[in-house]
């Protein structure tokens, strides 16, 4: 046993040893081991377990050996007990044997199990200990941190205390300094005020002295001006006299020179020139007219001769001159030019022969030898002939000087620079210089025949102006005379590109005429450049005058160049003959150069000149053989920019061919036939398109007749046999082509009926239909199409008739061709389509037709619009009929129609192109440029917005809008703008755009006036005047998706909005639910700052009352403030409830107590305060007595605690005590401007918030509200101030302000009206009468009853009403006041015209006074300073005597009764009046004749009379009548006032008659009526008391001594704000303090 016990001892010692090792293991922290160490520890532990298992297995295998060893190895023979035991065990059976001692294996297993349990228990205890240790460490760390923070806060608190002490000390010091400074500033202010008064006095004195000096200076200036005018007149007279003397001297010198030359020529034996003889009888007449240039004197004798004007017959009805015969010769241009016949005798009796040639030597430039008619004249130079001058009073240009000149001139005007601009070697350069000097400096006629004068150097008196006209005509005459010598040669025509004749080139001879030039003729110096000749002869817009008569030459034996001489009977044209030449307006060169300029090269000699705007007649053209060739293709219209500059009104260039002999034969038979057939009223520009052919050729005549539209000649020619009607000229054009080109429908019909080829094209491939379409001749085109012309024919360049029509903008032709089914897609050789042509020319209507005409929409609109265009808005909604390929067709350069429109800035065309849904705006040309790359700025903006989505932005008002009386048209959302969302728009851009739109809207509605959005400066950071900004936005809804500013989605805005089909963006503002008042501010237009201030007052004082005039939104403000306060308290965790009660006349104090108790405002004294917040709103407190209703609650409300209880006794006699707790808020509303009587006792116990009509927030509320309403109607845009809607809104604002101002002046504050009634003003653009009707209803339903009640209550406030109905005097006062208010406040400024307003006058309840008595209340018809409707009113009594009058009316006519007021005492005064009264009851008017007397001593009507007197006796000037009465006439009762009583003349008027308070009508301002005994006749200068009562027009007209002053009684339209605490004498009171 000892062995067993000894052997077991080591086994049982294991667990204690492991237990003793636990404290050592505590130092081993598993949490601090790394991952690798933890893996090592795990592996070690696993190895230990495996080793333990091996040991156990080994012990089990060796248990027998161990047992034997333990049992027998230590036994010996010394112990007998051991031997016995051994024997016992060996002898007995194994089953019966019992172990002597415990099995060691079982002991080992038990020990091992016990060790395992202990190990698990210790591990659990170790883990718990570790967790507790960790928690303890964490708490220790937190405690340490808190201790550190506590130390820091303590230190900071000490620092703040020190700083606060320093700040307090500094503030105290600053307060002391400021107080001392205030005293010093007060002293300085007093000193400055005294100095200011002194300066004002000095300034007044200086102003008086200055005004005196101004008067003196003005008088001196007037005298100086008079003297200067006299000096100017005298100077001009002397100048005129000097010019006459100079002219006379020059004429005498000229006569002397000519006589000397004549004598010399006679001596040489030149007797064959009878034209050189000068009749002496005419020399005397020459001295009567001055021909000198007004601004220059003659430089030398030779120059004076060269610049003398040549006479031109100006009056065709004067006696014709004697023709000077001339022999046929081959003389040069000068010789032929000097043999022209004379002209008409001037009106001054002065006349010269055109054959007077004065010769003088030319030493500077030797001229070549020249051939003269009767032999050479060596060394002689022809000079212009002097002539007389006749003033052309009718501004008619002079007729032709010679027929030869008319046949050879190529000028559109005699005075045109291109008329005589050619330089010829046979002329003296001094002559040319003089000629162009007159052309450059003279204020000659412009190209339309109008006299265009340059500003004269001095033009003071009429004499100088007359002299200027004389000088002007002198210059014109000289220019005409010189043009004859510098005109082109008749026999030397030249093409525009031919060499100049002066440079050595010579033209072919014509008709036997020999050239006068020699091949070696030197060039003449051309001097300075001449004015630029006109380049657009086809732009003349003057009508075509009658065609000139054909002049038949009698001398058939003369050559062609001798045709200058004509018979004297035919040489003078009839009075209706057109001026010689063609006047063509040059749009590019209207301003002429003032310096002399040399002549340009001649553009070519054309055949006979015709009047402006007319084509050349066929006969006249054929006489010279001038046939005009056409450009390739049909000619452009006369106003086309590409037309060449030629003299006649044609649009194609022409090369002039030599004259054929046959064409000049005057005896040709067909010439007479054409002449006899009659000229058409209008000659076309394109007369022929063939070469020079004989006039006898029938095809030529056929072309000419077709071109001119001569149906008679054309029908004669078509009836001839053997005529080829399809004959083509050199350019390939036929007669049908010419007729179609010139728009002669009858000729086209004749040719087509004669089987002319309808598609016969010219050399360039243009058919008659192409020509008609290009020129816009729709009737011709319609005929050609009816005869099956090819509508898709393409010329050589690919131009189709549709292309040409689009190019020239001929919409009717386009429509005709489209109806005929022409192809829109045919391209030219350059790749252009008709769409390109229409866009290139900028024809919007043509492009619209191309894109939309032919569809169902255009068919429907065609019945409404004859042109088929329809409105552009309708075409935008229609579907285009052209394909996408055609709209995107590119030319050779890759340009589409969009490229062309964008590059030229044609925004309208580009907008129509963009209307096609399949336009490829991003298509590039061959240079990789899109339409956007080549576009202008406007077109770039249009292209950027091509695919943009237009999303309207709205601001939700919801249920926060104020309840408006009678308004049912308020919208829950207001549209503020429309955003363009493009594909490239990001969410940041979208957020900025929305924010900017909201900010702009806030700024617009709160700005002054109708300023446009672009005129205002906006900034996101700044708030509007109402306090709203971007921060006021709560959320934004994109359709049904909620979005906030700055938020982004995965899709871009464009895709997101298009996918969700968002049509508008709704902006929600922060409201009372969020504890904010932004939405309330926007809904009511009350500034946010003021609402926040009201909320603060309710939270701070708990007892607040809002009071103001009726309709000042007191109830709305109280409810919104309570709602916001409720949500704020709820958000803070306090339950809150709003209790609303409406007070009426039957509302008792017991009901109020029950309300307080039920709402938990009053709680029993024994009950502790509750945490529930209660807001009680008492509305309409003005209907009850405040002292009776709230008198017992004043102390408990002011001191809320159980110490100040309120004892309430119930009906059963039980009395309970209650008190108000701190969580109760009481808000009241009163529709009254001020308290009176006993109610003033309640005032000090509440916080009162006054809502004044003339102060914010009420003063500008109506303006902001109506402006927002107007902007909503105009989709967020601000209309122009001139828009009728703006004018009607301004009128409504003026009505409200003027109405309250007048009521304030009348002393009736209870009648003041808030803006609530005016918020329902209808805004209907284009229907101003709707607003006027609404105003009449508002007047009848609200304004008039309130005014009537207020006036009656004022008049009878001193005594109770004895009678159930108002007396006649009271009714008279009410009607007079209503008439005053109607005309002064309501009708004044109405934008409706007078006639329209007359129709609505019967709807206003104020009487039936004729509207003619009302002054110009429409502000649009009078200037602001002239408006007589508003006058500054000061109702203090007048101190001067005046005149009074009385007016009475009957039903049919107004009759005047004298009202005499005798001077007397109180008991002797009486007033007699006759009043017409119209009863409005049951709609039947009744006339009441009141003949009763109102005693001034009675207490019944005296107050009313005094009130009427007070109204009519203000210091403002009245426009109705004067009250003729002395200040001593009325002495009523003893008055405490020291000032004399104002005068009064009672006037009874109908309540429906419109009148004016401060001005009524343009009646006489000082009518003389029957006056009192003391003042029988009014004197001028005596101050008169003004009456505001209406006066009939007929009576005023009878007694008005000066009717011209009827409209002069107007004053400035200025008003100032009326303040309730003004002086008593500045009010219109309806009751005086009478003792």
Swiss-Prot record:
Q: Where is the composition biased (Low complexity)?
A: 320-331, 375-395, 439-453
Q: Which UniProt keywords apply?
A: ANK repeat, Cell projection, Coiled coil, Cytoplasm, Methylation, Phosphoprotein, Repeat, Synapse
Q: Does the keyword tRNA processing apply?
A: no
Ranges of compositional bias, category Polar residues: 402-414, 454-466, 858-869, 1432-1452, 1546-1555, 1563-1577
Modified residue Phosphoserine is at which positions?
1498
| Positions of modified residues (Asymmetric dimethylarginine) | 484
Q: Quote a single Gene Ontology cellular component term.
A: FAR/SIN/STRIPAK complex
Among the Pfam families in the record, one is CortBP2
InterPro entries under this entry? Answer: Ankyrin_rpt, Ankyrin_rpt-contain_sf, Cortactin-binding_p2_N, Multifunctional_ANK_Repeat
Q: What is its main location?
A: cytoplasm
Q: Which PROSITE patterns match?
A: ANK_REP_REGION (PS50297), ANK_REPEAT (PS50088)
- Spell out the Basic and acidic residues composition-biased ranges: 193-205, 264-274, 1453-1463, 1615-1624
Compartments in which it is found? Cytoplasm, Cell cortex; Cell projection, Dendritic spine
- GO biological processes: regulation of synapse organization
- Where are this protein's ANK repeats? 697-727, 731-760, 764-793, 797-826, 830-859, 893-923
Q: Where is this region: Disordered?
A: 1-20, 193-219, 264-469, 483-582, 856-876, 1420-1469, 1531-1624
Coiled coil ranges (UniProt) are: 116-273
Subunit notes for this chain? Interacts with CTTN/cortactin SH3 domain. Interacts with STRN, STRN4/zinedin and MOB4/phocein; this interactions mediate the association with the STRIPAK core complex and may regulate dendritic spine distribution of the STRIPAK complex in hippocampal neurons. Activation of glutamate receptors weakens the interaction with STRN and STRN4.
Q: What does this protein do?
A: Regulates the dendritic spine distribution of CTTN/cortactin in hippocampal neurons, and thus controls dendritic spinogenesis and dendritic spine maintenance. Associates with the striatin-interacting phosphatase and kinase (STRIPAK) core complex to regulate dendritic spine distribution of the STRIPAK complex in hippocampal neurons.
Question: Can you say what this protein is called?
Answer: Cortactin-binding protein 2
Q: Which organism is it from?
A: Ornithorhynchus anatinus (Duckbill platypus)
């Amino acid at each position: 046993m000892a062995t067993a016990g000894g052997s077991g001892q080591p086994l049982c010692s294991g667990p204690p040893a492991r237990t003793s090792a636990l404290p050592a293991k505590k130092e081993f922290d598993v949490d601090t081991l790394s991952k690798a160490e933890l893996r090592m520890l795990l592996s070690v532990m696993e190895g230990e377990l495996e080793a333990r298992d091996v040991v156990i297995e080994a012990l089990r295998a060796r248990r027998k050996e161990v047992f034997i060893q333990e049992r027998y190895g230590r036994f010996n023979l010394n112990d007998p007990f051991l031997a016995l035991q051994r024997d016992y065990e060996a002898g007995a059976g194994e089953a019966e044997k019992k172990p002597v001692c415990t099995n060691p294996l079982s002991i080992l297993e038990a020990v091992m199990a016990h060790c395992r349990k202990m190990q698990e228990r210790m591990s659990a205890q170790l883990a718990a200990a570790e967790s507790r240790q960790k928690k303890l460490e964490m708490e220790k760390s937190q405690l340490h941190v808190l201790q550190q923070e506590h130390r820091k806060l303590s230190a900071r608190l000490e620092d703040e205390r020190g700083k606060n002490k320093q700040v307090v000390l500094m503030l105290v010091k600053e307060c002391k300094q400021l107080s001392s400074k205030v005293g010093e500033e007060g002293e300085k202010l007093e000193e400055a005020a005294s100095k200011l008064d002194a300066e004002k006095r000095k300034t007044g004195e200086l102003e008086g002295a200055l005004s005196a000096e101004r008067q003196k200076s003005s008088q001196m200036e007037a005298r100086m001006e008079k003297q200067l005018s006299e000096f100017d007149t005298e100077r001009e007279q002397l100048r005129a006299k000097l010019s006459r003397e100079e002219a006379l001297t020059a004429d005498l010198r000229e006569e002397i020179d000519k006589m000397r030359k004549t004598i010399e020529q006679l001596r040489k034996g030149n007797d064959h020139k009878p034209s050189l003889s000068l009749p002496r009888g005419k020399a005397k007449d020459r001295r009567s007219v001055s021909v000198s240039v007004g601004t220059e004197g003659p430089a030398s004798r030779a120059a004076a001769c060269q610049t003398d004007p040549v006479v031109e017959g100006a009056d065709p009805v004067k006696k014709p001159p004697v023709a000077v015969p001339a022999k046929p010769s081959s003389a040069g241009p000068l010789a032929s030019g000097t043999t022209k016949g004379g002209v008409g005798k001037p009106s001054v009796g002065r006349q010269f022969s055109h054959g007077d040639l004065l010769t003088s030597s030319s030493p500077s430039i030797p001229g070549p030898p020249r051939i003269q008619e009767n032999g050479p004249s060596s060394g002689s130079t022809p000079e212009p002939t002097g002539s007389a001058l006749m003033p052309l009073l009718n501004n008619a240009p002079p007729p032709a000087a010679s027929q030869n000149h008319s046949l050879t001139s190529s000028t559109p005007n005699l005075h045109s620079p291109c008329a005589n601009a050619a330089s010829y070697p046979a002329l003296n350069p001094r002559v040319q210089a003089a000629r162009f000097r007159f052309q450059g400096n003279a204020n000659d006629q412009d190209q339309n025949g109008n006299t265009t004068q340059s500003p004269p150097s001095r033009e003071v008196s009429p004499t100088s102006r007359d002299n200027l006209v004389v000088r002007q005509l002198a210059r014109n005459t000289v220019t005409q005379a010189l043009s004859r010598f510098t005109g082109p040669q008749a026999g030397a025509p030249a093409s525009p590109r031919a060499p100049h004749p002066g440079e050595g080139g010579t033209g072919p001879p014509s008709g036997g005429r020999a050239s006068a030039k020699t091949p070696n003729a030197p060039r003449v110096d051309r001097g300075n450049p001449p004015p630029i000749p006109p380049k657009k002869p086809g732009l003349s817009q003057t009508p075509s005058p009658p065609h000139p008569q054909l002049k038949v030459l009698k001398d058939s034996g003369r050559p062609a160049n001798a045709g200058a001489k004509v018979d004297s009977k035919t040489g003078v044209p009839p009075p209706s003959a057109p001026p010689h030449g063609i006047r063509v307006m040059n749009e590019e060169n209207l301003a002429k150069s003032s310096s002399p300029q040399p002549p340009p090269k001649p553009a070519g000699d054309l055949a006979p000149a015709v009047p402006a705007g007319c084509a050349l007649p066929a006969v006249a053209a054929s006489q010279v053989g001038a046939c005009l060739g056409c450009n390739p293709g049909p000619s452009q219209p006369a106003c086309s920019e590409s037309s060449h500059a030629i003299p006649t009104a044609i649009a194609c260039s022409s090369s002039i061919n030599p004259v054929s002999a046959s064409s000049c034969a005057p005896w040709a038979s067909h010439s007479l036939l054409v002449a006899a057939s009659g000229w058409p009223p209008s000659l076309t520009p394109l007369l022929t398109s063939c070469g020079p052919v004989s006039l006898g050729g029938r095809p030529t005549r056929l072309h000419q007749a077709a071109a001119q539209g001569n149906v008679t000649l054309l029908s004669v020619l078509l009836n001839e046999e053997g005529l080829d009607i399809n004959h083509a000229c050199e350019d390939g054009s036929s007669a049908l082509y010419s007729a179609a080109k010139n728009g002669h429908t009858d000729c086209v019909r004749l040719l087509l009926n004669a089987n002319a080829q309808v598609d016969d094209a010219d050399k360039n491939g243009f058919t008659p239909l192409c020509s008609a379409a290009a020129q816009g001749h729709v009737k011709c085109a319609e005929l050609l199409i009816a005869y099956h012309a090819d509508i898709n024919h393409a010329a050589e360049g690919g131009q189709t008739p549709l292309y040409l029509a689009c190019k020239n903008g001929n919409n009717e032709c386009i429509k005709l061709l489209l109806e005929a089914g022409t192809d829109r897609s045919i391209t030219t050789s350059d790749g252009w389509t008709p769409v390109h042509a229409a866009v290139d020319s900028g024809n919007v209507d043509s492009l619209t037709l191309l894109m939309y005409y032919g569809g169902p929409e255009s068919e429907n609109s065609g019945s409404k619009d004859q042109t088929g265009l329809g409105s552009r808005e309708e075409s935008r909604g229609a579907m285009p009929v052209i394909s996408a390929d055609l709209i995107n067709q590119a030319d050779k350069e890759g340009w589409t129609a969009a490229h062309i429109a964008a590059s030229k800035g044609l925004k309208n065309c580009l907008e129509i192109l963009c209307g096609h849904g399949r336009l490829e705006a991003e298509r590039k040309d061959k240079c990789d440029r899109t339409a956007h790359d080549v576009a202008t700025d406007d077109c770039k903006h249009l292209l950027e917005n091509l695919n943009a989505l237009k999303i309207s932005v709205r601001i939700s008002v919801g249920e926060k809008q104020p309840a408006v009386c009678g308004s049912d048209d308020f919208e829950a959302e207001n549209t503020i703008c429309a955003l363009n969302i493009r594909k490239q728009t990001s969410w940041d851009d979208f957020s900025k755009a929305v924010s900017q739109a909201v900010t702009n809207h806030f700024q617009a509605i709160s700005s002054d006036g109708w300023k446009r959005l672009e005129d205002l400066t906006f900034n996101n950071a700044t708030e509007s005047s109402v306090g709203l900004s971007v921060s006021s936005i709560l959320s934004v809804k994109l359709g049904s998706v909620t979005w906030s500013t700055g938020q982004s989605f995965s899709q871009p805005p464009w895709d997101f909005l298009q996918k969700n089909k968002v049509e508008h963006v709704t902006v929600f503002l922060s409201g009372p639910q969020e504890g904010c008042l932004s939405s309330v501010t926007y809904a009511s237009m009350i500034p946010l700052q003021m609402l926040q201030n009201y909320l603060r007052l309710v939270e701070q004082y708990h007892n607040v009352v809002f009071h103001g005039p009726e309709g000042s939104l007191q109830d709305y403000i109280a409810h919104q403030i309570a709602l916001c306060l409720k949500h704020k308290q709820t958000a803070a965790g306090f339950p809150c409830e709003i209790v609303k009660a409406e007070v009426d006349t039957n509302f008792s104090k017991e009901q109020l107590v029950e309300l307080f108790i039920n709402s938990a405002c009053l709680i029993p004294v024994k009950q502790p305060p509750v945490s529930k917040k209660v807001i009680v709103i008492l509305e309409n407190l003005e209907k009850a007595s405040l002292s009776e209703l709230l008198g017992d609650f004043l102390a408990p409300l002011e001191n809320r605690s159980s110490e100040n209880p309120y004892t309430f006794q119930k009906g059963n006699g039980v009395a309970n005590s209650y008190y108000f707790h701190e969580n109760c808020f009481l808000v009241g509303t009163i529709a009254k401007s001020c308290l009176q009587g006993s109610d003033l006792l309640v005032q000090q116990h509440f916080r009162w918030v006054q809502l004044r009509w003339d102060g914010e927030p009420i003063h500008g509320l109506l303006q902001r509200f109506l402006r927002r309403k107007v902007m909503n109607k105009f989709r967020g845009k601000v209309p122009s101030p001139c828009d009728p809607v703006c004018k009607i809104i301004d009128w409504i604002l003026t009505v409200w302000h003027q109405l309250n101002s007048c009521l304030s002046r009348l002393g009736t504050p209870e009648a003041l009206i808030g803006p609530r009634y005016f918020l329902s003003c209808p805004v209907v653009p284009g229907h101003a009468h709707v607003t006027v009707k609404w105003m009449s209803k508002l007047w009848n339903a609200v304004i008039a009853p309130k005014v009537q009640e207020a006036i009656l209550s004022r008049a009878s406030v001193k005594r109770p009403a004895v009678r159930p109905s108002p007396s006649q005097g009271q009714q008279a006062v009410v009607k007079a006041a209503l008439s005053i208010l109607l005309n002064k406040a309501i009708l004044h400024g109405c934008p409706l015209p007078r006639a329209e307003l007359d129709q609505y006058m019967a709807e206003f309840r104020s009487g039936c006074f004729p509207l003619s008595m009302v002054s110009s209340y429409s502000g649009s018809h009078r200037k602001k300073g002239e408006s007589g409707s508003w006058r500054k009113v000061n109702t203090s009594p007048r101190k001067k005597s005046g005149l009074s009058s009385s007016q009475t009316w009957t039903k049919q006519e107004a009759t005047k009764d004298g009202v005499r007021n005798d001077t007397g005492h109180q008991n002797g005064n009486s007033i007699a009046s006759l009043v017409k009264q119209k009863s409005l009851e049951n709609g039947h008017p009744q006339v009441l004749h009141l003949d009763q007397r109102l005693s001034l001593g009675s207490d019944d009507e005296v107050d009313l009379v005094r009130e009427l007197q007070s109204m009519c006796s203000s210091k403002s000037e009245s426009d109705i009548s004067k009250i003729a009465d002395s200040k001593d006439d009325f002495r009523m009762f003893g008055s405490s006032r020291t000032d004399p009583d104002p005068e009064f003349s009672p006037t009874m008027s109908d309540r429906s008659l419109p009148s004016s308070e401060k001005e009524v009508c343009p009646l006489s301002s000082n009518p003389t009526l029957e006056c009192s005994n003391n003042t029988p006749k009014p004197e001028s200068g005596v101050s008169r008391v003004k009456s505001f009562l209406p006066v009939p027009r007929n009576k005023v007209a009878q007694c008005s001594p000066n009717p011209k002053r009827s409209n002069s009684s107007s004053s400035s339209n200025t008003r100032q704000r009326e303040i309730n605490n003004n002086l008593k004498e500045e009010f219109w009171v309806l009751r005086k303090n009478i003792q």
